[in-house]
Amino acid sequence: CEKLSIGLTYRSQITMDVKNGTATFTVPPSLASNFPSGPFTSTLPLPQVATLGLGYAVNDKLSFAFDANFIGWKALDTIAFYYKDTTASLKPTKLPRDYKNTFAFRLGAQYNVNDKLTVRAGVALSLTPVPAGYVTPEVPDANKVNLTCGVGYKFSAHFVADASLTFENLTRTDDNIALQLNGTYKTYILAPGLSVIYQF
């Protein structure tokens, strides 16, 4: 079918190694010998990602695109820091994450109003990999819904401008098992974008 296009991509899991990090502890002078500053090592696995993309041109003016991602966050079970110099008080730091595999979905539409003006709109759903009890302040993740809109204008054969706007609003209340931190995390994003392209 000439109107339908399909694409598949896969990115394997990658492990990032920290081989010579520097750990610095700010503690009262009386405890400084128990928490010596020095090198540490760690590893951070980045998840595998498989993507299916579909595109469909209804006619010369209207087209749709759909993406589905499988993200292997289960690889991130624990973040651990191993210190070269340990004491009775300073042991390897292990932060449990227990993330789960998850999915993300995106749907977008583009409409060519005329030869110069194009309008776009989209919605995305990202399911959180963070289970209950493992939400942390640095990554207060929750299921996310993004709404986007945009407009493009072709001023000439060489000059094109595009503007976009992304909106995201999420809230999650959770208890962290390891850190004993309870709280409600709120994120509000309103991100405008502008690009200008000039082709020689």
Regions found by a protein language model. Name each.
Residues 1-200:
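Outer-membrane beta-barrel porins/channels
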